[in-house]
Amino acid sequence: MRYIPLNNSVYKRNRSNFMNEMKGNSLAVFNSNDIYPVSADSELPFEQHRDIFHLSGIDQEETILLLYPPSKDDRTREILFIRKSDNHTKVWEGEKLSKKQANELSGIDNIYYIEDFKAVLSSIATKVDTFYINKNEHYRANSPVETREDRFISWLLKKYPAHNVAKSNPILQRQRSIKHPHEVDQIKRACEITRKGFNRVLKFIKPNIWEYEIEAEFIHEFINNSSKGFAYSPIIASGHDNNVLHYIKNNKQCKSGELILMDVGAESVSYTHLTLPTKA
């Protein structure tokens, strides 16, 4: 990773806050995002699901977090499942997190490899009445792509049809809107990296440059400051493309006398900055 991880006390607090709002005799499960293929042997860069990152600090694919607050055994109150490195993985992708590393990042003591998940879930599911599931409930969510979380929820409800279901999303929406001081520090850092990017670009812009050249200046500054890169697809729209809400082609030449609209932000430890003050 390019960033210094947050202290795991942040994630311990986040998990504790979430579990305090869960109904009695229930458990919650959170899944990482998929890695999406683009051809026979190449993939898009991995982006962790923000909710499981908020609760664990684990930035790795094939990760599952299980929370079971009623447990009388601390070993089953918080359980993390991670991908196991094999020889093929070590050669082609590099080492995945060890259990020790996952513990240091998350503050979770009980860690299994992901192939043990269904057996562990089965041993706990018979003891609870309610499953908390984590569906995307954003009012603009309309993607036809079935996520890893979607597949898990379909499997879970078919496997355990007699259990009640509760929603994790309303709890997380409330809790994620209140940031820990360490999280605020990362937002400030994202702001500072973004500021450096804009300062660099303002010195670079001149008539007849191309929008993608401006994009290149931003990404140079972001990565040079240990950011993962753009927090979202950058919008660099000159001329009449100012009027397009989500113009991301960035392939036009910027003519003299035109305005350039830029909607760009850097990411720092999965945090970003999207707002500007009206007076600065």
Q: What is each of the regions a protein language model found here?
A:
Residues S56-D59, W155, N242-Y271:
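Acidic/histidine-enriched ion/cofactor-binding microenvironments in catalytic or ligand-binding pockets
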Residues M1-K196:
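A composition/biophysics-driven feature that prefers long, compositionally simple stretches
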Residues M19, S26, I35, K188, ...:
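Short, well-ordered alpha-helical packing segments
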Residues H273-A280:
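Single conserved hydrophobic/aromatic residue that forms the stacking wall/gate
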Residues N33, N136, G239, D263-G265, ...:
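Anionic group-transfer/hydrolysis microenvironments
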Residues I4, N8, N142, S177, ...:
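Hydrophobic alpha-helical scaffolding
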Residues H182-F222, S226, Y232:
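Active-site pocket-lining segments that scaffold enzyme catalytic pockets across diverse folds
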Residues G229-H240:
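Short, basic/aromatic beta-hairpin or loop at an interaction surface
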